[in-house]
Amino acid sequence: KNSGLESGLMIVQYVAGASLAELHGHAMPRSAFSTSTSAGQEDHVSMGATACWNLLVATERLSEVLACELFVACEALEFEQLQPAAHVRSLKQRVRVISPPLDGDRSTSKELKKIANELWQGGWLARIEAECGRLPR
């Protein structure tokens, strides 16, 4: 709202960019790093456990990126007089319980973390579909 005095959503963009950069790092296939072991008697180590760990961390980073996108989308809806679809309205209401609309610069780190956690746990989809009907798959 106050260009030049407030940063708006700039920091949210930085957070999303940092999480996305880390997500790219976790997308590298672990099988590319197989190594011989047991004095050369074993020529393959699957790195399956490492790949699973990277998948878990990657889903956490993805939830952070999506939380930033969702946060920005909810802010954008504050400036439009349009009525979004029922599922979007329900999702926005859930976000607004965690994060009220911006009325100036403030730290949103705790809010973004809570939104990311809700997305990562996956409970919102079931509750929104129970309220508004099943989304097409």
Give a label for each model feature.
Residues 1-137:
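C-terminal auxiliary extensions adjacent to catalytic cores
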